[in-house]
Structures are given as C-alpha cells and as structure tokens.
C-alpha cells in the first residue's frame, strides 16, 4: 500500500499560525505519527461526515478531505470550532 500524500491549504497554514506554540508542537508531532501510522489510536484519525479528522492535542483537531489519493488539510483549531464545522 502506498503511503498517503499530505497537502495543506493556505487557510490551514493561516489557522496553524494562530495556534499557541505548544499546540503547534503537538500538531507537528502528531503529523509525524500520522505519516508513520495513520491509525495509531492516539490520533483518533477517522471519517466524520465529509471530512477526515485527526487529533492535534486534547482540545484541538485538524480537518481534511481525501482527493485523488492525497489528504488535503483544510483547517486546524479548537474542538469547539471543530464541532461547528462538522455539523454544517
């Protein structure tokens, strides 16, 4: 099986840049784990409606979509905003 290719949108990077540094570090660590083992239980990587969701710390999530064999990361932020996005 080929490894999943990951891309992030400008909107994702803008949101990432607004996160506290400690959350950015956790997100970076979790991204490395995601590339090595996408279904590691600590990541909670799963399909949620039209999105794929992954943990970026206890109170933060990232959302992406699968497109042509790649994962396109669209957003990262607090769980409270995540709940609103996935319910749309």
PLM regions with names:
Residues 14, 33, 81:
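Active-site micro-motifs of SAM-dependent methyltransferase domains
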Residues 23, 34, 49, 69-71:
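Hydrophobic alpha-helical segments
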Residues 18-21, 36:
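Secondary-structure boundary motif
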């Amino acid at each position: 099986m080929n490894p999943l290719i990951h891309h992030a949108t400008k909107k994702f990077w803008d949101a990432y840049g607004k996160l506290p540094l400690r959350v950015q570090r956790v997100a970076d660590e979790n991204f490395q784990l995601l590339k090595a083992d996408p279904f590691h239980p600590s990541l909670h990587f799963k399909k949620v409606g039209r999105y794929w969701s992954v943990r970026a710390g206890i109170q933060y999530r990232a959302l992406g979509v699968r497109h042509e064999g790649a994962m396109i990361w669209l957003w990262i932020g607090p769980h409270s905003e995540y709940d609103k996005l996935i319910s749309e």
